[in-house]
Amino acid sequence: MQWHRHTFESLPKNDLYALLRLRSDIFVVEQDCVYLDLDNHDQNSYHLYAKNTEGAVVAYVRILPPGTAYPQVSIGRVVVEKSARGKELGIELMVRAEEWAWDLFERERDVVIMAQSYLLQWYGRLGYVAQGEEFLEDGIPHRIMIKSNK
């Protein structure tokens, strides 16, 4: 597995296409959720992704600077390609994303995610704690979760 870290400006255009395709495959097609994925946050975000030995993007996450979606740094668009699931790749993806977020910004900062409710327990294993009530985002139940690095 090869890991890549980029700003929007430094993303190779073929990789940008591949990660947008992966996001669409999972969030729109697999989850049967019609929504606008391109939300104008990608340009100011940091992009972390993994490619398999064939060079295909199989995991992706974006890091949003504090003040973009939340007062804190946030991690979103967490995706692992279907054939790459069940191999702890999602855990490695999140750990790498958290470390990069804390390196980019203040290590003491909390990290916020908007988690699909069916993944609360999975994110909980990584140290995230649910906040507030469940809500619908694009017809899918979600909860805000926060991980403190204090």
Please tell me what each predicted stretch does:
Residues 83-85, 107, 114, 118-121, ...:
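Acidic/histidine-enriched, beta-strand-rich ligand/metal-binding domains
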Residues 66-75, 85, 105-109, 139-141:
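A conserved beta-turn-beta hairpin within the catalytic core of GNAT-like acetyltransferases
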Residues 112, 124, 129-144:
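Conserved catalytic-core motifs of GNAT/GCN5-like acyltransferases
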Residues 38-43, 67, 136-137:
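A short beta-turn/loop motif at secondary-structure boundaries
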Residues 1-35, 39-47, 51-56:
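Short amphipathic alpha-helix that is part of the acyltransferase structural core
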Residues 49, 56-66, 71-74, 79:
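Conserved beta-strand in the GNAT
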Residues 80, 86-99:
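Conserved acetyl-CoA-binding loop-helix of GNAT-fold acetyltransferases
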Residues 94, 101-116:
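Conserved GNAT acetyl-CoA-binding A-motif
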